[in-house]
């Protein structure tokens, strides 16, 4: 009873906090964004030059690569105006503190943050957008590019979609994981970052309760053997009442059962880096992981470690269920940005210019929201014309998000924010 009352209190508190009205809008910044959305990148570049020449423009983000993008942006201005002496100062807060940092900066007497690259859809919506701390900007040339999905990536504006995929060690060949339910069988302990260390992992679990992804989970269950179904059936039946309690779609008990097993069984790790170096070892035979796909790029080949010691689950013929999940990096403008024109130009540069996206696009597993500036990584495993590391041959965004192939579970801002204080609290009750 105490747990129920506590949950209800937290739910009410959360709704009260995040349901409050927006803070006073900054009309001047809003007006500049409205003008900027009608301008070309070159026009924005002129505005940025006039606004920030000789100034230090601060940016803050979840990705350290924003620093490289900022340096490239400055060089882009100098191509047109060699006398430009402005700079981009980039910072990367640790331990999920970016929300607090942006809030404090916005409320300070002299805000300094001009632009942000931020992740975690649920918190962005509930803490930053609904409260009016961050403003959205959609560049004209991005909006007009063929293949851009404005509905999925425009509000908030996504820089990129990043994939985290299931993989397993194949050194002794003792196990094959051909169904996403295989990763939550009795005794399985996939290596995964703790949910408090990287909350985008919780967004993945939230999205599993959305109708589209519920079908992925149920379809994978139906492909199981009769013996495997006998193991999972009691768990699914026991959890079914939660579907109504959490106001979820039909058949969500399949997703809730999978989530419960995953959350209570996974091997909690501090970061994807250590997971990636562990899963590729000969000594890690039979181990599994759910990690950022791009980590495979930095594996040092040796007698003990090799990319060829693992298999990407979704790449196996006949694999059933989702192959992993995808989260996004979003580009936003703080409401009290001191350099709104420069922020708009910088954002436009990152989503419309191949050089602007290059700090992220140079690696597999990250896909720009603008398909025209993505790089091809389908032969990243080739050495001297020979495909020596097939697991590194990225099949691309379209393959990974297809319901017929990779079936990534993709975070959606509104859905994640909407279930954070229902499904999210239930997940918290499961955590070890």
Question: What residue ranges belong to the model's regions?
Answer:
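Mature extracytoplasmic/periplasmic domains
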Residues: 324-408
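Extracytoplasmic ligand-binding site segments that recognize negatively charged/polar headgroups
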Residues: 56-75, 88-103, 111-274
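Extracytoplasmic/periplasmic substrate-binding proteins
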Residues: 253-256, 264-336, 383
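Bacterial signal peptide processing site
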Residues: 21-23
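Positively charged n-region of N-terminal signal peptides that target proteins for export
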Residues: 1-4
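Conserved C-terminal helix/tail region of periplasmic/extracytoplasmic solute-binding proteins
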Residues: 30, 37, 393-432
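Immediate post-signal peptide segment of exported/extracytoplasmic ligand-binding proteins
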Residues: 25-27, 33-57, 78
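C-terminal motif of bacterial Sec signal peptides marking the signal peptidase cleavage site
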Residues: 16-19
């Amino acid at each position: 009873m105490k747990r129920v009352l506590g949950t209800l209190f937290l739910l009410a508190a959360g709704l009260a906090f995040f349901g409050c009205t927006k803070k006073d809008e900054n009309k001047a910044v809003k007006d500049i964004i409205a003008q900027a959305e009608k301008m070309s990148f070159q026009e924005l570049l002129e505005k940025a030059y006039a606004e920030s020449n000789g100034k230090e423009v601060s940016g803050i983000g979840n990705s350290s690569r924003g620093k490289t993008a900022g340096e490239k942006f400055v060089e882009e201005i100098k191509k047109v105006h060699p006398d430009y002496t402005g700079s981009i100062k980039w910072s990367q807060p640790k331990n999920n503190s970016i929300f607090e940092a942006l809030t404090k900066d916005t409320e300070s007497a002299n805000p300094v943050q001009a632009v942000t690259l931020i992740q975690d859809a649920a918190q962005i919506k509930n803490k930053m957008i609904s409260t009016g701390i961050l403003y959205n900007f959609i560049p004209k040339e991005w909006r007009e590019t063929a293949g851009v999905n404005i509905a999925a990536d425009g509000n908030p504006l996504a820089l990129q979609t990043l994939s985290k995929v299931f993989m397993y060690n194949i050194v002794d060949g003792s196990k094959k994981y051909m169904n996403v339910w295989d990763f939550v069988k009795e005794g399985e302990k996939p290596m995964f970052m703790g949910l408090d260390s990287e909350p985008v992992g919780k967004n993945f679990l939230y999205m599993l309760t959305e109708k589209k992804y519920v079908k992925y989970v149920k379809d994978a269950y139906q492909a199981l053997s009769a013996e495997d179904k006998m193991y999972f059936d009691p768990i699914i039946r026991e959890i079914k009442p939660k579907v109504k309690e959490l106001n979820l779609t039909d058949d969500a008990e399949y997703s809730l059962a999978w989530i419960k097993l995953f959350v209570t069984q996974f091997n909690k790790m501090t970061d994807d880096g250590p997971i990636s170096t562990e899963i590729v070892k000969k000594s890690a035979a039979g181990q599994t992981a759910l990690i950022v796909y791009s980590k495979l790029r930095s594996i040092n080949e040796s007698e003990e470690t090799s990319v060829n010691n693992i298999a990407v689950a979704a790449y196996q013929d006949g694999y059933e269920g989702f192959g992993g999940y995808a989260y996004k990096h979003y580009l936003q403008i703080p409401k009290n940005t001191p350099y709104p024109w420069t922020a708009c130009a910088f954002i436009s540069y990152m989503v419309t210019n191949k050089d602007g996206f290059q700090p992220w696009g140079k690696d597999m597993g990250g896909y720009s929201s603008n398909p025209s500036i993505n790089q091809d990584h389908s032969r990243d495993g080739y050495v001297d014309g020979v495909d020596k590391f097939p697991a590194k041959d990225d099949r691309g965004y379209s393959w990974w998000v297809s319901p017929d192939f990779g079936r990534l579970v993709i975070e959606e801002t509104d859905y994640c924010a909407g279930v954070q204080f229902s499904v999210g609290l239930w997940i918290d009750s499961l955590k070890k």
